[in-house]
Structure formats: structure tokens, C-alpha cells
Amino acid sequence: MKHRIQHIHFVGVGGSGMSGIAEVLLNLGYTISGSDLNESAVTRRLAELGMRIAIGHDRANVAGAGAIVTSTAVAGDNPEVLAARAARIPVVPRAVMLAELMRLKRGIAVAGTHGKTTTTSLVASVLAAGGLDPTFVIGGRLTSAGANARLGQGEYIVVEADESDASFLNLLPVMAIVTNIDADHMDTYGHDVARLKSAFIEFTQRLPFYGSAILCADDANVREIMPFVSRPITTYGLSPDAQVCAQDVQADGTRMRFTVQRRDRDVVLPALQVELNLPGLHNVRNALAAIAVATELGVDDAAIREALAAFKGVGRRFTQWGDLPVPAAHGGGTFTLVDDYGHHPVEMAATLAAARGAWPQRRIVLAFQPHRYTRTRDCFEDFVRVLGSADGVLLTEVYAAGEAPLVAADGRALSRALRVAGKVEPVFVEDVGELPQAILDFVRDGDVVVVMGAGSISKTPALVGELA
């Protein structure tokens, strides 16, 4: 590619999936420019790295580019896309560019409805600890690296594979992880779960004959597709029949301790004692996927243990903001603030269970911003059930993400349904900008407040910290 194209322009460069690819290409020696509608910490960091970043979309931004990269979030009538097409500049989908990067190395792709970002981060961290120096492109900020991408000198590249638009079918990895399969982004699959499962089967079939499919044995939908996967399979999970299996799992505050039993066909490998610096059974499963990959690639057990014990997490994945003061008007004391990206009922339930495991004697308060009207509609009853499992709930209006409002699928409807269910009395905060103060008005000494959602609620924890 490089002998023909020197300058690549990214439309929507501030997105989590776009910025990482741009950074790796910059480090490979390409001239990279990009544009985004809004300035952010991500765009500022990319500019500091040496990219030419424009805020706002304009035809002039693509001048001199040999190709432009877009994501599915970029509309076809974007002025930069139109200018590129008029000038016969190739318009490359993000996933196609990611596939091009993977072609340069041996790819490890992590797919699944939930847990992709954390699992990808764990795989990258364990391989790095094992001296394999991987390249990685992740959908979240890996705390230890201070970035969501890095160009390594080793032969492997670890990437997050996005099923939301079926673009993961562009990738050609040599190892593929499937964490779970759940009904989300169903517009892509015609609201047909069978089509969704078929896409994951096709994803595994894109492995070479010598490749490896690392599949979660605990997920019913993943188990259903296993008979149709024709590549070598390694299973992982809490299920006793998994080849990489966690036993004697115990929560120790926000850490998990467990023993890993591993079978490589008929060979039983030595048991591995693990202390994971993440809470929750869902993160035990994520760690098992990383252990399965590391074991197959010959990473030393000591390096695996070290990486998992020292793992510093990923941005907005059970990120702890520490203990903050409760206003004196509410009795004083402190509360613990946690920030999480979860926005699907399955993810929310796993995070709340992790919080209860970490702080079993404390009140768990959930501050939640629903993400997309279609998801709220499709998962309405599941949202009511999960929200009702918290001890206190603050609920905002839906973050639309470009969607038009839907009748009976907004924040007020969720709040009413939750009130009727009778398990918890919700506080509805229509404007997410008022949520930080609402949290401080609600909390009491000893509470654990989990701020959750994939939209503008991401700004809330910092604002709570400023007000507290």
C-alpha cells in the first residue's frame, strides 16, 4: 500500500475505532490527517502525535490525501466523502483498513456482543508480558498504555472485531475469540437471530485451516454454533467441560482469585493460580480467553499471572473514581464512584453483580442513560428487570445516537415501568447535564454509585468530582 499511497485522511478520526487505526498507520510512517465534528481528548492527543486534525467537516480537508477512511457513523453525504468520490480518491471503510493492517502481521481478532474491549486489552497485556510485543487496536483506552492502539515489533496484532455492522467479516485473523452472542444491533441482521449466529460462524470460517477459534463454552448461543465451526476449537469458561476452565472462583474486593485447569487435547497442563485485577465473573471469562490465547502461543505461566495481577483496566470499564464526600446536608461521609460503558441489559447485570461482589454490604445506586431508542424498545423488559436489581436508580432520557424518538421507548417510559414494577423508586432526570447534582442529592454515606451508559453520560463522573 505504502508505495502508492503516502497520505491517508480519516473522517471521524475521534471515534474509538478510528483513532487507533490512524495512530498505528502514523507510526508505520504514513502522513495522517483527520477530521471530527467535535474536539476531544482523543483529537488533541492525535494532534500532539503529529496528525493534522480539523474540527468540522469540509471538502478542503481531503486535499492531498491518497485515500480516506470512514466508519459506518459517517453519512454518505458527508462533504469530505463527496469530495473524495468526485476526485476519485478511494473511500475505504474502517474495517477494510483494519483488515489491511492485519495482513501485515498475524491477526488475533476478538468478537462478541459483550466483553470485546476488555478481552482484547487482556490479550494484548498478556502477550506483552510474555515478550511478544504485539500491535493492538482496541475500542477503549488501555490504561497501562495510555492509548487504545500501539505499534509493536512482534509478529502479532490484536484487534477488536465489530459485529454491530457485520464489518468483522472483512477480517482474516489466524486466531479468533468469540466471547458471547446476544441480540443487539439487530437492524444489521434483519432482526433475525439465526442470521446473527450465521455471521459469527462465517467469522470463524475466515480463519485459515491451521487457525484457532477460541470460543466461550458458557454462552448458549456460542455453544449452538460450535458444531458448524470447521476450524480447530479451544473452549473456555466456568463450565467444567471447557478446555480452559476456572475453578474455585472467589471475589476479593475488586479482584478475583481462581484456579485455571487447562487441557490441550488429551494433555493436561499444570494448574494455574490466578489473581485478576478486575471484578466479576464476566471478567474471569474474559481473562480465560486471554489465557487460552497465551497458552497456545507459548507464553510462560509466570508472565500470564503477572499480567493479570497487574492489569490496570480499560477506560470506562468499571473505572473507579475513588471515594467522594457526601454533602453535609445529607449526613456527610463518603460514597464510591464507578464509571462503566455498559449499555445493554446483559452488560449492566454483569457490572452490577461485580459491584455487589466487591462491596456486598453496601447500597448499590445505578445512574443510567439508555443508549438508542431501538435498543430501549427491543430490550425494554430486560432493562426494567436489571434496573430493578439496583438499590437506587437515577434514570436520564435516552441518548439518541442519531435515532428519532420512539413512542413508549424513552426514559420516562422506562421510569414509569420501573415504578410500576415496584422494586425501586426511580429518580428521572431528563437533562443529563443535571445528573451530577442529582447524584449528590441522592447519595448517602457508604453508597456505591455506578454511572453507566455509552452516550454523553461519560462526562458525568468528572462533573460529580468537581461538584463534590
UniProtKB/Swiss-Prot annotation:
It catalyses: UDP-N-acetyl-alpha-D-muramate + L-alanine + ATP = UDP-N-acetyl-alpha-D-muramoyl-L-alanine + ADP + phosphate + H(+). It is found in: Cytoplasm. GO terms for molecular function: ATP binding; UDP-N-acetylmuramate-L-alanine ligase activity. It holds the Pfam family Mur_ligase_C. ATP binds at residues 112-118. It comes from the Bacteria. Pathway: Cell wall biogenesis; peptidoglycan biosynthesis. InterPro entries: Mur-like_cat_sf, Mur_ligase_C, Mur_ligase_C_dom_sf, Mur_ligase_cen, Mur_ligase_N, MurCDEF_pg_biosynth, UDP-N-AcMur_Ala_ligase_MurC. Keywords: ATP-binding, Cell cycle, Cell division, Cell shape, Cell wall biogenesis/degradation, Cytoplasm, Ligase, Nucleotide-binding, Peptidoglycan synthesis. Disulfide bonds: none annotated. It is an enzyme of class 6 (ligase). Its EC number is 6.3.2.8. The keyword Transferase does not apply. GO terms for biological process: cell division; cell wall organization; peptidoglycan biosynthetic process; regulation of cell shape. The keyword ATP-binding applies. GO terms for cellular component: cytoplasm. Belongs to the MurCDEF family. Cell wall formation. This is UDP-N-acetylmuramate--L-alanine ligase. It comes from Bordetella parapertussis (strain 12822 / ATCC BAA-587 / NCTC 13253). The lineage of its organism: Bacteria, Pseudomonadati, Pseudomonadota, Betaproteobacteria, Burkholderiales.
